Regions:
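Short glycine/proline- and acidic residue-enriched helix-loop micro-motifs
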Residues: 110-147
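Phosphate-coordination/substrate-recognition cap region in phosphate-metabolizing enzymes
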Residues: 42-117
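Alpha-helix capping/helix-boundary segments
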Residues: 61, 179-180
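Short beta-strand scaffold positions
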Residues: 56-57, 150, 174-175
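Acidic, low-complexity terminal tails and accessory targeting/binding regions
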Residues: 2-3, 89-101, 161-170, 181-224
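A mid-sequence, solvent-exposed acidic-amphipathic segment
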Residues: 134-166
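Active-site-proximal alpha-helix that buttresses catalytic centers in soluble enzyme cores
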Residues: 2-3, 8-76
Length: 224
């Protein structure tokens, strides 16, 4: 038996628009973020896709995305389990900072997005450098690459095992872009060097109790 994990990045937020570091820091969904979450739900419903259980990061932007999508899909009564395991990377003292200031301070690169797109930086390098730069904080809550990967992998495995144990066929899990990409690298999926996921995109994985088989990546077809 297998179960399907439909892993969704949250909708667009105010910090996304303002280009601010957004890990544990939270900002509300924009009007577009709300509309995209609802469009995702409607698109899934039109394709006859329903969920047996639903999970979301306990950060508001993810939990709100999950609720909006499920309500739009006609699954208003499906409860959402919020979990810290699906959270975004913790950036410590850099939370809420403009991404260009963050990139300049840590790497001497003035344009964060351009550096990512040009592959001057990887998500792993950013996370490892961020935790190292937070060593002056006690406790140091910033996460490096391995910490994020292990946390998300353990969480998704637990979710998958619970679904299999209950005979659930399909699970929604709303998380965050960087964390999802780090996890995909961890399980050996080739992201093609992609360092950003689209808001409200779907990444699908089939779980057999031991292994994940990624069958869809950064898919926006249900929001259109």
């Amino acid at each position: 038996m297998t179960t399907e994990l439909w892993i969704v990045r949250h909708g667009q937020t105010k910090f996304n628009v303002e280009d601010r570091v957004q890990g544990m820091a939270n900002s509300d969904l924009t009007d577009k973020g709300i509309a995209d979450a609802r469009a995702l739900g409607r698109g899934l419903a039109q394709d006859g896709i329903t969920f047996d259980r639903a999970y979301a990061s306990d950060l508001t932007r993810a939990a709100d995305t999950a609720r909006l999508a499920l309500d739009a899909a006609g699954q208003e009564k499906l409860a959402i389990t919020e979990t810290v395991g699906l959270r975004e990377e913790n950036y410590g003292k850099y939370e809420g900072q403009l991404t260009n200031d963050f990139s300049q301070e840590l790497f001497g690169l003035p344009n964060f997005t351009a550096a990512l797109l040009a592959h001057q930086l990887t998500l792993a390098q950013i996370a490892d450098a961020t935790r190292a730069a937070n060593e002056d904080r006690v406790p140091n809550r910033a996460e490096d690459n391995a910490m994020v990967q292990n946390r998300l992998d353990q969480t998704l495995r637990t979710i998958g095992q619970e679904a299999l144990g209950e005979g659930d066929r399909r699970v929604l899990a709303v998380s965050h872009g960087t964390a999802i990409l780090m996890w995909l690298n961890f399980i050996g999926f080739d992201t093609g060097g992609q360092e950003m996921l689209h808001n409200a995109s779907v990444t699908g994985a089939v779980f057999d109790g031991a292994h994940f088989n990624v069958v869809d990546f950064d898919d926006l077809k249900w929001t259109k």
